[in-house]
Amino acid sequence: MKTLGPEAAIPTVVSGTLTTVDHHKISFQHFKNGGLAVIIIAHGYYNSKQCLLLQQLTQALGKEYDIFMFDFRGHGKSSGVFTWTSREGNDLRAVLDFIAPLYSQKGLIAFSMGASISINVLANDKRVDSFVCVSAPSDMSRIDYWVWALDWKKDVAYILFNSQGKIGKGVRPGPFWLAKEKPIDNIGKITIPVMFIHGSRDWVIRPWHSEALYQKTGGLKKIISIKNGPHAEYLMRDYPTQFVAEVKSWFLDTLIKNDS
């Protein structure tokens, strides 16, 4: 990790598109501070890189790292429809094709279905050096959706009626019946350091998913349960200080520090 001076306080932001092997356009933003390490942020379902919570995460991590954000297909400014993790691995691979040659160290933080996609990619792709996996489903067919446990004010009104909560939201859904890999079958193939973070109040994907994935992870690993924490990106809304501190500490410990 490179120590940044005051002149790097305002990053250079590059926006563009990447093309996947199956010809989809993937929209990205690259925040460049001159760091030797980059953190890739992979959003969850119904979110995008424009989500204010992820923009806040970018600001929090951008003081120490360059940041690369992108939209999965069917979300934000990317093309196509969302295939419920079946083909979105091509989107992350296109990101790694572009970003991996530019940095000596690459971290990835992924949320919910984005984390599920990431596990399936990282099982065979070794171009990421450290991984933070937030609220990941261990098996797409076993997502919980405990509707009776949701907080109507925070979980529904925030998205539908809050002006900030609506920014960056939306999805263009595609076929859900396509074959899907199971993260629980792939997590054991990942050899890089992995930290799992899950909110204890997550009603969409219950904490047992992260616990099951953690048990099958063979390398350096850690699991964090945030008491009363909600699902995925909303941990940044309700517990930003704790969430950011855990992420920063993990990447500090698992990405090689380069002082230059």
Label each residue range with its predicted role.
Residues 73-102:
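Catalytic nucleophile-loop/oxyanion-hole region of alpha/beta-hydrolase
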Residues 1-33:
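N-terminal cap/lid segment of alpha/beta-hydrolase-fold proteins
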Residues 201-205, 233:
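Acidic catalytic loop of the alpha/beta-hydrolase fold
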Residues 58-79:
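Conserved alpha/beta-hydrolase
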Residues 123-176:
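Hydrolase active-site cap/lid region
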Residues 190-191, 196-198, 202:
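Short beta-strand/loop motif that positions the catalytic acidic residue
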Residues 229-240:
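Catalytic histidine-centered segment of alpha/beta-hydrolase-like enzymes
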Residues 45-58:
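The serine-hydrolase catalytic nucleophile loop
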